[in-house]
């Protein structure tokens, strides 16, 4: 919200997010620990309603924890992506293991027939490795559109696959 120039308040967050938890845990674990019912249908319906009400040609539906992260005890983030049938913007950051994690996510998305609109590789802080290196390694094995977001350079600093 803040990045979009919106005021962050409990009301503004609840208008776009069905559940929000303090602990940085997979959604199913966070819901279980908070005593919140894990209702995949409610999550899917809420998200579809948000998309409809926005009336926009684009909608960012942010997942938590990655493509294969459990959303509920019986559904993964990738299940929601497939049910919504939206193009995927995959976000990665350069760290040890990122090549493997990113290629695995790409393969999982491809196996489900999900369109990867772009892979955004961000640099979370100035000390992080250059995102271009991760882009080069990913592109060595899989051809996907890639955009780079260097630290402090704005949303999209360059396009590694152009």
PLM feature spans:
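Glycine-rich phosphate- or other oxyanion-binding loops that anchor nucleotides, phosphorylated ligands
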Residues: 33-48
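Beta-strand-loop-alpha "switch" segments that mediate conformational coupling across diverse proteins
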Residues: 25, 139-160
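Beta-strand->loop->alpha-helix junctions that form or flank phosphate-binding loops
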Residues: 14-19, 120-123, 144-154
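N-terminal phosphate/diphosphate-binding loop that engages ATP/GTP or pyrophosphate donors
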Residues: 1-37
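Conserved catalytic-core segment of NTP-binding enzymes
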Residues: 42, 49, 63-143, 147
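Loop/turn-to-beta-strand initiation segments
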Residues: 54-59
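Short, surface-exposed amphipathic charged segments that create phosphate/polyanion-binding patches used
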Residues: 30-33, 132-136, 157-162
């Amino acid at each position: 919200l803040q990045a979009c120039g919106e005021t962050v308040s409990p009301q503004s967050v609840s208008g776009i997010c069905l559940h929000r938890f303090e602990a940085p845990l997979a959604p199913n674990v966070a819901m279980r620990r908070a005593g919140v019912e894990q209702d995949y249908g409610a999550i899917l319906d809420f998200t579809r309603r948000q998309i409809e009400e926005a009336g926009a040609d684009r909608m960012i539906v942010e997942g938590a924890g990655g493509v294969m992260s459990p959303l509920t005890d019986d559904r993964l983030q990738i299940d929601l992506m497939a049910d919504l049938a939206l193009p995927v913007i995959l976000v990665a950051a350069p760290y040890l293991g990122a090549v493997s994690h990113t290629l695995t996510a790409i393969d999982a998305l491809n196996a489900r027939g999900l369109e990867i609109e772009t892979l955004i590789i961000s640099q979370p802080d100035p000390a992080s490795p250059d995102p271009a290196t991760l882009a080069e390694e990913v592109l060595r094995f899989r051809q996907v559109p890639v955009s780079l977001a260097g630290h402090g350079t704005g949303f999209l600093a360059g396009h590694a696959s152009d």
